[in-house]
């Protein structure tokens, strides 16, 4: 286990665990946050504590020896990918946000919700800020537009399911943890060359550009 006393440090544990699970050695590793909110797990009688880490590795071919596979984080956060312009699911997203804003109990709350949604999702006169990944996820959670928000509520109605924005859910609060990691890496690549931890030994400038764009979720100016 990552936290066993046999490991020399809190970073060596996750490194060894990740390699056993995937066969991949990690380069850059950074501890993020500790997550322990009781309502995030759907279990009222227990608290699950998760210590999260961001680890980078180079892409390699998948091995049948391990029960692991590569996934794009945009499978879980399709609204974060603006490389080809506004995502195709933007209409569903705007509709859900509009209903949440309209359902506010009073004018002040309605105005606050509208301003918050506009700032986080680049609506009205606001520009898209790629670093606000966690804040966008938390807003969608609050607006009950993702499945994780309804866990523990019993059977989910068809109306509620129809309101969900696209994006694969994850167990417990793992999508929230992933959002934290994405936000951290997007901010990190702006002032530290960690992107090279993801690149092969030899690469072209175009490959480097494509990697940065994939992380940032938007095109970069050459």
Question: What is each of the regions a protein language model found here?
Answer:
Residues 18, 39-64, 182:
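Active-site-adjacent beta-strand/loop module that shapes the phosphate/pyrophosphate-binding cleft
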Residues 63-80:
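Flexible, glycine-/basic-rich loop-and-beta segments that form/coincide
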Residues 171-191, 202:
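Short alpha-helical segments that sit at the start of domains
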Residues 213-222:
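Short, positively charged loop/turn segments that connect secondary-structure elements
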């Amino acid at each position: 286990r990552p936290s066993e006393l046999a490991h020399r440090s809190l970073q060596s544990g996750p490194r060894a665990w990740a390699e056993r699970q995937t066969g991949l050695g990690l380069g850059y590793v950074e501890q993020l946050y500790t997550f322990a909110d009781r309502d995030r797990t759907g279990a009222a009688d227990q608290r699950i504590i998760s210590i999260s880490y961001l680890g980078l590795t180079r892409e390699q071919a998948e091995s049948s020896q391990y029960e692991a596979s590569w996934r794009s984080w945009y499978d879980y956060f399709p609204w974060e990918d603006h490389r080809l312009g506004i995502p195709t699911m933007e209409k569903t997203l705007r509709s859900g946000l509009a209903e949440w804003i309209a359902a506010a109990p009073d004018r002040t709350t309605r105005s606050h919700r509208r301003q918050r949604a506009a700032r986080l999702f680049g609506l009205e006169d606001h520009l898209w800020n790629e670093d606000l990944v966690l804040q966008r996820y938390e807003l969608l959670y609050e607006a009950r537009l993702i499945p994780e928000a309804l866990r523990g509520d019993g059977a989910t109605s068809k109306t509620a399911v129809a309101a969900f924005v696209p994006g694969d859910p994850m167990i417990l609060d793992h999508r929230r943890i992933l959002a934290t990691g994405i936000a951290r890496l997007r901010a990190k690549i702006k002032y530290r060359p960690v992107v090279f931890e993801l690149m092969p030994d030899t690469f072209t400038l175009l490959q480097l550009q494509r990697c940065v764009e994939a992380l940032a979720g938007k095109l970069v100016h050459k």
